[in-house]
């Protein structure tokens, strides 16, 4: 998955990260507006480090190398999995999809999605189109 864009809806204030696969599959991760604004600054130029940046720094300081972020579904909910290497062994931790996007952006990590995550995203997009079919238009985040 490639990060297509990060937006904040002018109408409702919701934020979202649009991820697109090579096959055209689209996944939108809802972000709170503050996180969306933080992540939309490509260079991370803020006076205060984010928690994600601290976490990535601590991984490096402890000899842990982050690998990739994988979006998956568990119990009908989207989640992100961060893989990393510790002492030559692969390990995985789960986090929220929002945290996964932050890790992707700030850690310059590759992202993937399971077939279940893509199907989940497609079904959510279909419901969003049904409920917000009015003046929202194609750029509406929700």
Where on the chain are the PLM-derived regions?
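Divalent-cation
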Residues: 1-142
């Amino acid at each position: 998955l490639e990060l297509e864009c990060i937006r904040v809806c002018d109408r409702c204030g919701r934020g979202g990260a649009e991820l697109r696969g090579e096959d055209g599959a689209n996944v939108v991760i809802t972000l709170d507006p503050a996180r969306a604004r933080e992540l939309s600054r490509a260079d991370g130029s803020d006076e205060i480090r984010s928690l994600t940046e601290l976490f990535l720094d601590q991984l490096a300081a402890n000899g842990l190398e982050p690998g990739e972020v994988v979006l998956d579904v568990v119990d009908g909910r989207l989640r992100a999995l961060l893989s990393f290497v510790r002492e030559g062994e692969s390990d995985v931790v789960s986090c929220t999809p929002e945290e996964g996007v932050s890790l992707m952006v700030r850690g310059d990590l590759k992202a993937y999605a399971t077939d279940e995550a893509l199907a989940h995203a497609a079904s959510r997009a279909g419901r969003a189109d049904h409920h917000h079919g009015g003046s929202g238009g194609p750029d509406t985040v929700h």
